[in-house]
């Protein structure tokens, strides 16, 4: 429904607006373990306590969500929402199966918790289509975030939120108080591009390019990394999540990696509690296959 759409200055602004209207200092936000560093930073700015929810090779674990809710409620704290990236998650690259999405929505609905569904990578699948958006199953309890930053141009800073009617006015007021309105120039540019250009073909070409680079990274990891290391095998998006033996500190290793002209993000950046020191996020979206192998 177009009436449910709130245009934002990228989906990052939508995260800020949601945090502003929901979070009081000390409130709890549930998030996947690991989770997007930009979201964690926003929640921290509003003094939320982030409680990470267990994940596995398929994404967020429903029983882990039940356990996290129970633990937080028993501590007497308030849960304001669950933040998640179900499609090619950042940083893991995992695609959450449809049946888990339904189960997670049922849990959230039963417990009276909003779900913030962040979906910047949903159109960037290589191997199979993404399941339906979680908001398609529950428009009253899911806030859906979208962005053109990963599919058209990050510098345009145009995103959107699909919000329940009960929240839209609050989000509009919060947005007006911070930026007055998103850039009309950027919106008109995006609108014209979508109307006049073969944007679906452009995204398909991106997917073909990223798939080749993803394959090069996975092949290189198989060839060069030790058998004690593990990594995800994403079907889309930008990222591979690597888990090394626990004695390896990826943050301490970073200076040596930079000297060798290798860039990654240490795993601790994706946890609010400093966990994940033996993990790292690798990105294959920019370097060529030759550079990835090098």
Predicted segments with their positions:
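Conserved core segment of the aminotransferase class I/II
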Residues: 136-138, 143-208
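Short, conserved charged micro-motifs
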Residues: 248-253, 290-293
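Conserved core of the PLP fold type I
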Residues: 1-111, 122-137, 143, 210, ...
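Conserved glycine-rich beta-strand-loop-beta hairpin in the small C-terminal domain of fold type I
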Residues: 191, 208-218, 229-243
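Glycine-centered flexible beta-alpha turn that most often forms the glycine-rich phosphate-binding loop
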Residues: 118
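PLP-dependent enzyme catalytic core of the Aspartate aminotransferase-like
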Residues: 259-261, 272-294
